[in-house]
From Swiss-Prot:
Chain residue ranges for the region called Interacts with SPRY1, SPRY2, SPRY3 and SPRY4: 131-142, 167-178
Similarity field: Belongs to the caveolin family.
Entries under InterPro entries matching the protein: Caveolin (IPR001612), Caveolin_CS (IPR018361)
Annotated GO biological process: caveola assembly; cell differentiation; negative regulation of endothelial cell proliferation; receptor internalization; regulation of cytosolic calcium ion concentration; T cell costimulation
Species per Swiss-Prot/TrEMBL record: Aotus nancymaae
Interacts with SPRY1, SPRY2, and SPRY4: annotated span: 149-160
Ranges annotated as spanning the membrane: none
Gene of this entry: CAV1
Presence of the UniProt keyword NADP in the record: no
Chain positions found as Phosphotyrosine: 6, 14, 25
Full protein name: Caveolin-1
Length: 178
């Protein structure tokens, strides 16, 4: 371990988070973390990308997983020539495959840049604006809630209890006239 970096058991190089670097109570190496039964924190920017399973959380299983059979189907008794069916299958599959690759090559990096900026702004606003506003509101509303609670218990509770006692002796009887 040198210069704020360490290597895990698989040989991956990780940076030590800034918060962890100066804290003597938190271990910076795996052996010490295991010894103290603490979870090792990894830097999110150095994790590996799985090039085989590109949708590990199954976000697009039901949306864009469209095959030839999902789009084009010939019912029994209405079949085209076998050669046409095979050529249609090949044309559809190859066109979809290469056109997707072309679109992702042209627009993938710009779209990743746009979405990265968007989610960075969204995260920034959530961390630095939304959560502090909500916390501030909860602190301010706490004093109002105490006053409101006192008002309910001293004014509304006795009032509605008295109204309830007044109407508790009211009896309604329904008779059907023939």
């Amino acid at each position: 371990m040198s210069g704020g970096k360490y290597v895990d058991s698989e040989g991956h190089l990780y940076t030590v988070p800034i918060r962890e670097q100066g804290n003597i109570y938190k271990p910076n190496n795996k052996a010490m973390a295991d010894e103290l039964s603490e979870k090792q924190v990894y830097d999110a920017h150095t994790k590996e990308i799985d090039l085989v399973n590109r949708d590990p959380k199954h976000l697009n299983d039901d949306v864009v997983k469209i095959d030839f059979e999902d789009v084009i189907a010939e019912p029994e008794g209405t079949h085209s020539f076998d050669g046409i069916w095979k050529a249609s299958f090949t044309t559809f599959t190859v066109t979809k495959y290469w056109f997707y690759r072309l679109l992702s090559a042209l627009f993938g990096i710009p779209m990743a840049l746009i979405w990265g900026i968007y989610f960075a702004i969204l995260s920034f606003l959530h961390i630095w604006a939304v959560v502090p506003c909500i916390k501030s509101f909860l602190i301010e509303i706490q004093c109002i809630s105490r006053v409101y609670s006192i008002y309910i218990h001293t004014v509304c509770d006795p009032l509605f209890e008295a109204i309830g006692k007044i109407f508790s002796n009211v009896r309604i009887s329904l008779q059907k006239e023939i």
